[in-house]
Amino acid sequence: MKKPSLFQIIIIVLSIPTTTGRTVGNLRVREGSPFKIAIFADLHFGEDTWTDWGPGQDVNSVNVMSAVLDAETPDFVVYLGDVVTANNIAIQNASLFWDKAISPTRDRGIPWATLFGNHDDASFVWPLDWLSSSGIPPLRCPAASDDDGCTFRGTTRVELIQEEIKSSNALSYSMISPKELWPSVSNYVLLVESSDHSKPPVALLYFLDSGGGSYPEVISNAQVEWFKTKSNTLNPYLRIPELIFWHIPSKAYKKVAPRLWITKPCVGSINKEKVVAQEAENGMMRVLENRSSVKAVFVGHNHGLDWCCPYKDKLWLCFARHTGYGGYGNWPRGSRILEISEMPFRIKTWIRMEDGSVHSEVNLTYD
């Protein structure tokens, strides 16, 4: 009997049931086409739902995503955290707003994955003026919410993913971490297979929960050890390119950040604020910089930054683009796009704006 190859073993390992008890298949490149990913960052659905302004922001955010999806027709979508602003959602089931944020992608039959930001499970913050003579305004709950669900209680990270998976029509690739990594929840890896079954995988996509909200903004030592074990098992010879996604930038982003203007080798269009990094560094960047297979890290969190800069001449550190009309800042909205080509292997990225324009294209593959 012929022994399976290393790549066949990797595919088998990544097809085992996840913590949620379901089996998630692998992604696959379409024959003759590159594999394209759209990143939606910082949508911040559910803000000020007791006003006319808040729901209007969500409509605008849907329009941004729809414009990007129709222009780029991606194979996959990554929701890069702060999908909702839970500290502004005055109902128990924040997943109803999470579902609204996912809907443009799901309605087009495009698979996706999500990870958490610092606002997704934050506790509800009571506006002080509600406790004055004006009183608490009537809550505007989504139609799917009953009276019991229209209360002042948050929704946990685990509950959000569980509800997402239930309503995903099998399009969600999101997973729940092993419990030993909790309270960090969105830690998992996805494999992008070649269109040719006889060829090795094209890429490994790692998703990490950078915390915030219900616990500190940090990638823990336990997560670092999980990544080391997972990556060394799946990619021991560093032959498969790896891309990393999390929400809050690491401190390494501060080291490469442009001082004022974005100049080469960095590429981007806005540099309007300082990098707001994780609270502590527990060795994740040291692990990544020592893996030649890691090509780039993608984060959100800072709405006024959209650049990519090389780090130690080994990998790229990239911000996405603020996609949602929720959250701070009035910079034009858009989405970072990734394109992975097989033959020859190449990773390109650019930013697609709501108005249809494209800018800041850069090759993330070192020759």
Swiss-Prot record:
Q: Which GO terms describe its cellular component?
A: extracellular region
Q: Report keywords, A-Z.
A: Glycoprotein, Iron, Metal-binding, Secreted, Signal, Zinc
Q: Could you say which residues form the signal peptide?
A: 1-21
Return any one Pfam family short name: Metallophos
Any one GO MF term held by the record is: metal ion binding
Top-level taxon in the UniProt lineage: Eukaryota
Which cofactors are named for this entry? Fe cation; Zn(2+)
Instruction: Name the SUPFAM superfamilies for this protein.
Output: Metallo-dependent phosphatases
For whether the record's keyword set contains Secreted, the answer is yes
Glyco sites are at: N93, N290, N363
- Write out the residues that bind Fe cation: H303
Q: In which tissues is it expressed?
A: Expressed in stems, leaves, flowers and siliques.
Task: Describe how the cofactor binds.
Answer: Binds 1 Fe cation per subunit.
- Indicate which residues the UniProt annotation says bind substrate: H301, N302, H303
Has the keyword Signal been applied to this entry? yes
The record's principal subcellular location, in a coarse class, is: secreted
Instruction: Kindly state the subunit structure of this protein.
Output: Homodimer.
PANTHER family found in the cross-reference section: METALLOPHOSPHOESTERASE DOMAIN-CONTAINING PROTEIN, PHOSPHATASE DCR2-RELATED-RELATED
What is this protein's name?
Probable inactive purple acid phosphatase 16
The species this protein belongs to is: Arabidopsis thaliana
Name the gene. PAP16
